[in-house]
Amino acid sequence: MAQTKENNPAPRAKAPAAPKAAAANGTVPAGEKHTRPTTRRPYYNRRPRRAQQPKEAATPIHIYPLGGLGEVGKNMTVYECNGDMIIVDCGLVFPDSEMFGVDMVIPDFTFVVQNKDKIKGLLITHGHEDHIGSIPYLLQKFSLPVYGTRLTCGLIKNKLEEFGLAGKTKFVEIVPRQKIKLGCFTVEPIHVNHSIPDAVAFAIDSPAGTIIQTDRKSTRLN
């Protein structure tokens, strides 16, 4: 009798074994790949991060613009830190056509007169009238040393002679890059280019930080 060969069915592929569970300490068994979940937490469910607030200076500095802020002319700024004050510029502004009978407009000196014992000096950036024009009227209230470059001091002296104040005022001639110590302030004059010679800006260093004071149209020279 002829023998017949049975048709055996093809072997089925084995189902992939289930991945072994991770150990209690979070390690993955040898031979297994560590996969990250594909689902992510919706953005709106995330906890918002608190914005970092700027750190306040341990020693604050106060700036009082008595003129020249939002206007052209009458430049005068007072800086206060650690109980010390300095003044930068003391100018005037000429009246417009609607100010009949007014020759000039000067800053209100009430604040500086009330704090005259704290003021260490008056620093002048350059010799334009909107920066030096009110100095005689301030020095009539009380005396204080005036710091400026050679040309600037010369222009101020000529102005003070008309008021009889030139011999009563102490002038300190400053040179760019030579620092001046006034109370807690250290002021460095910086040579700048302006429409009048011998103009400077000031780098005013204090325990609260450094501030650059200059005229609005000045540009630095290297």
List where the protein language model places each region.
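Intrinsically disordered, low-complexity RNA-associated tracts
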Residues: M1-K55
